[in-house]
Amino acid sequence: MVNAVVTTPSRVESLAKSGIQAIPKEYVRPQEELNGIGNIFEEEKKDEGPQVPTIDLKEIDSEDKEIREKCHQLKKAAMEWGVMHLVNHGISDELINRVKVAGETFFDQPVEEKEKYANDQANGNVQGYGSKLANSACGQLEWEDYFFHCAFPEDKRDLSIWPKNPTDYTPATSEYAKQIRALATKILTVLSIGLGLEEGRLEKEVGGMEDLLLQMKINYYPKCPQPELALGVEAHTDVSALTFILHNMVPGLQLFYEGQWVTAKCVPNSIIMHIGDTIEILSNGKYKSILHRGVVNKEKVRFSWAIFCEPPKEKIILKPLPETVTEAEPPRFPPRTFAQHMAHKLFRKDDKDAAVEHKVFNEDELDTAAEHKVLKKDNQDAVAENKDIKEDEQCGPAEHKDIKEDGQGAAAENKVFKENNQDVAAEESK
């Protein structure tokens, strides 16, 4: 007698709607990744403890002392947290609502309809509708489906893979991406001023208007029968320069801040902004790319819309800007292209002695090889790894690494968080 083979649905949505009471073992995360996970709705209500800062961008374009005050507030949040809620950001509630309705309408369609837009991860094509494959360091899956595509500049987009239904998806998403691009310029200006640089310096360093890519990723997190055992998105930092995130007011974003997981509140009419690895590198670690993850719940479906602002993969060498380096603060990061930085994160999963993410260094540990490696002056010419990486796709997802928390707060081991064969490309992830 041949035993029947039980197959797990390829989409998390189908699995969630199948009526299961326990999640399949491939979705159960290792215990060390589950520290700090409780009832997300109760966590979100807590007022005690650290809170993600809220930055008011009203009159950020002002020429007077107000912009200097805004600069100080945003700079402080970027240095201390690397993430913030942006309010009075200049993007209308009407447009944001259109973007949300379009994304939710697409995911409300039957899975069979969405499969018409399925990506081909096995062949490196990550644009379109998909789910994470079991390619993280621990071999486990994430409780998430997604839709991913390049959103800006217009000449880099492939509209053929954008959803045709609803009809407002393309116009709403296109206009939103255009306005996020303008907002990114304003933020990069403030961050440049905060480092004592010329206003346009950081924008130039990440590719300028011509080459900075905006990648859209809609994350769909179905209800989960055992949310205490699963993760929607594994712990990671974004490789982007900046990441801008909308959500449907269902909590789920957690930040690893000062040795503990902090749940972000749902702030009405706000956009969450992350500082990514790219800006952290250029600022020599003055601005932080914070470790974060997405948790799930059994009561409500959660959506997030992430736009990752990424530099070109090969044109620019990412390294600390000369103005951020002193004898007391030598370069903390070796020079790499963006593609090499992504590959470094993707392929460090087996190098457990060296791959340590966001490690707190003592003075006598400055030579320790880690993800955020502190280089001595005589090592500044060290060659970045994985030099021969080629770009197979113009666009690739922007979330690229997993960090497994070791329970001690400071040292987190690098894991691979990739969309599968991502052209050593990336958002992910809120």
Swiss-Prot record:
SUPFAM superfamilies: Clavaminate synthase-like. PROSITE patterns: FE2OG_OXY (PS51471). Its cofactor is Fe cation; L-ascorbate. Pathway: Pigment biosynthesis; anthocyanin biosynthesis. It catalyses: a (2R,3S,4S)-leucoanthocyanidin + 2-oxoglutarate + O2 = a 4-H-anthocyanidin with a 3-hydroxy group + succinate + CO2 + 2 H2O. Induction: By gibberellic acid (GA). Binds 1 Fe cation per subunit. Residues 376-407, 415-430 have a biased composition (Basic and acidic residues). Its EC number is 1.14.20.4. Oxidation of leucoanthocyanidins into anthocyanidins. This is Leucoanthocyanidin dioxygenase. It comes from Petunia hybrida.
